[in-house]
């Protein structure tokens, strides 16, 4: 897989070239970084809320564009949210998942939304 940035900060290597999505990805990096540094329910709830909001926005953009990879992409989101909600996804897992997901799964929609 791709190396996880340390410190965990979004950089241009994560660009999808959709400003709304790139800005949301930046927010996810910040939320997961905060969760890992602070811990506790509040930081975790904030990260989860950011993930849900972003996934819904991204999935809606895929549906509007009739993007062919929508079903598999949505399933990946749901699997990840299940692990986060179930408590089996620590900060290191979340950082790695987001890094790999953006650079492999999200990059497939470049130029298609």
Curated annotation (Swiss-Prot):
**Residue numbers binding Fe cation 2:** 58, 73, 77, 101, 106
Alphabetical list of Gene3D superfamilies matching this protein: Hemerythrin-like
Any S-S bridges, and between which cysteines? Answer: none
Q: Which InterPro entries match?
A: Haemerythrin, Haemerythrin_Fe_BS, Hemerythrin, Hemerythrin-like_sf, Hemerythrin_metal-bd
Residue sites binding Fe cation 1 per the record:
25, 54, 58, 106
Q: Which CDD domains match?
A: Hemerythrin
Q: Which UniProt keywords apply?
A: Iron, Metal-binding, Oxygen transport, Transport
Q: Which GO terms describe its molecular function?
A: iron ion binding; oxygen carrier activity
Free-text function comment from the UniProt entry: Hemerythrin is a respiratory protein in blood cells of certain marine worms. The oxygen-binding site in each chain contains two iron atoms.
Q: How does it assemble?
A: Homotrimer.
Q: Which family does it belong to?
A: Belongs to the hemerythrin family.
Name this protein carries in UniProt: Hemerythrin
